[in-house]
UniProtKB/Swiss-Prot annotation:
Single Gene Ontology BP annotation: Wnt signaling pathway
Segments in the Extracellular topological domain: 23-369
Protein name: Kremen protein 1
Residue ranges occupied by any Kringle domain in the UniProt entry: 29-112
Residues annotated as signal peptide: 1-22
Gene Ontology CC: plasma membrane
Membrane-protein topology: Single-pass type I membrane protein
Highest taxon of the lineage: Eukaryota
Cytoplasmic side, ranges: 391-452
Species of the source: Xenopus laevis (African clawed frog)
Domain (CUB) ranges: 212-319
Length: 452
């Protein structure tokens, strides 16, 4: 199978895991529970005889239009696709006004259903679709119900009429029939942006949604931040292990990332060495999907005791090496992609030492033009040092002086202090420069898996 990705790999003996940057190859209609992220093209309220939607640039008599939101806020634009610009329980659109004064309707979009949302079903009441424990609450939210069911070790959680929660393991929950998603749009009493079923209609969820930690071994899955779709709590420290037998690459794609606090963070670690491969936080958001050349990865999330946000959803997919091929180009020739990774030095280096690698290249270059450089440990560093210094020296002094300068520079490299950071900038067909650099504002790693 040919995968539409653009790849650059860096392999270093000091850090045996290669982290690969690639273009975004995952796509799903919705990853939020209310479809606020829907950017599809359905332009009628239902695929089966629904009302046609009005264009957002022709609805100036209504609150939401392109005149008021000219920069694409909420996905609005010169189109008539269903959207959810106001954070309602599901996408909707304006319609030609009816005799009863209705001028908008929810859109029933089968493809806009976040993973873990099993759908909307009939509830005849005797017996109910889920036959475990139940409760009612005037503060009901989706995660409140899911948490109760998960604590009681039920696999399914269902909500009905905005305030009722049901738990169970019933495999035949579909027996009374599946209904349109709009039948389950009664707002949750505890959060009016979330759908909590309807009258005689129950919306079902997998109870793993929003769990703080878990173990995954399937080829693909979606992992949500703790307490999702509610905001994540304070003081969280969660681990998810992802170990896929025979996988050579695991691809990660953050389909949602809303972490505003710079002290809250998401890390991906080598499952074998516990070394941090990449870190994201409130200031450093993931902008692309990326591959990790391992079959065992740990996802770690930490939140401090102040501030909260929506959190994240991440899709992972495991591949065998023969299924990955490079394309000839990219959809965005002008875009320069960059990834930064910080790694620990060798076991004998000082604990405060770090190496910062910054690799840049253009995805528009044909794959045949992308250098296949592989840098091995200190040998690679020595070669790059000699090339860079020799090239500069040739402009001014003889070859003998250049070799002396290279030897002197190599000695000074080995005498660098333990707390010093080296940055390597590499661009195809351009010069290579190596220089020491202090990493400002780097907080100590709060991940207990990383040794002191």
């Amino acid at each position: 199978m040919v995968m539409d990705i653009w790849t650059i790999s860096l392999r270093i003996l000091l850090f045996p895991s290669a982290l690969v940057l690639c273009s975004d190859s995952f796509h799903s209609e919705c990853y939020t529970v209310n479809g606020a992220d829907y950017r599809g093209t359905q332009n009628q309220t239902s695929l089966d005889g629904g009302k046609p939607c009005l264009f957002w640039n022709e609805t100036f008599q209504h609150p939401y239009n392109t005149l008021k939101y000219p920069n694409g806020e909420g996905g609005l634009g010169e189109h008539n696709y269903c959207r959810n610009p106001d954070g309602d329980v599901s996408p909707w659109c304006y319609i030609p006004e009816q005799e009863d004064g209705v001028y908008w309707k929810y859109c029933d979009i089968p493809a806009c259903k976040m993973p873990g949302n099993l759908g909307c079903f009939r509830d005849h009441g005797n017996p109910p679709p889920l036959t475990g424990i139940s409760e009612t609450s005037n503060k009901q939210t989706i995660q409140t119900c899911i948490t109760m069911c998960r604590r009681q070790r039920y696999k399914l959680a269902g909500l009905e009429a905005g305030f009722a929660c049901f738990c169970g393991n019933n495999a035949d929950y579909r027996k009374h029939g599946e209904m349109p998603s709009t039948d389950c749009n009664s707002v949750c009493f505890g959060d009016h942006t979330q759908p909590c079923g309807g009258d005689g209609r129950i919306i079902l969820f997998d109870s793993l949604i929003g769990a703080c930690g878990g173990n995954y071994s399937t080829d693909s899955a979606v992992i949500y931040s703790p307490d999702f779709p509610d905001t994540y709590g304070t003081g969280k420290a969660c681990y998810w292990t992802i170990q896929v037998t025979d996988a050579s690459i695991i691809r990660f794609n953050f389909t949602l990332f809303d972490i505003k606090d710079s002290r809250d963070m998401v890390e991906l670690l080598d499952g074998y060495t516990k070394q941090v491969l990449i870190r994201f936080d409130g200031r450093n958001h993931p902008t692309h999907s990326f591959n990790i050349s391992l079959d065992f990865v740990i996802l770690y999330f930490f939140s401090d005791r102040i501030n909260q946000a929506q959190g994240f959803s991440v899709v992972y997919e495991a591949f065998k090496e023969e299924t990955i091929e490079k394309p000839n180009g990219s959809n965005n020739p002008s875009q320069t992609e960059m990834i930064t990774q910080t790694t620990n030095l060798s076991i004998n280096a000082a604990r405060s030492s770090k190496i910062l690698y910054v690799i840049t290249t253009s995805p528009s270059r044909p794959s045949g033009h992308v250098p296949g450089w592989t840098i091995y440990a200190l040998t690679g560093l020595l070669i790059l040092t000699i090339i860079a210094i020799s090239a500069k020296a040739l402009l001014h002094i003889s070859m003998k002086s250049a070799r002396l300068a290279s030897s002197s520079s190599l000695d000074s490299c080995h005498r660098g202090s333990a707390g010093e950071i080296w940055s390597i900038f590499y661009k195809p067909s351009t010069s290579i420069s190596i220089f020491p650099k202090k990493l400002k504002g780097q907080h100590d790693d709060r991940n207990p898996l990383v040794g002191e």
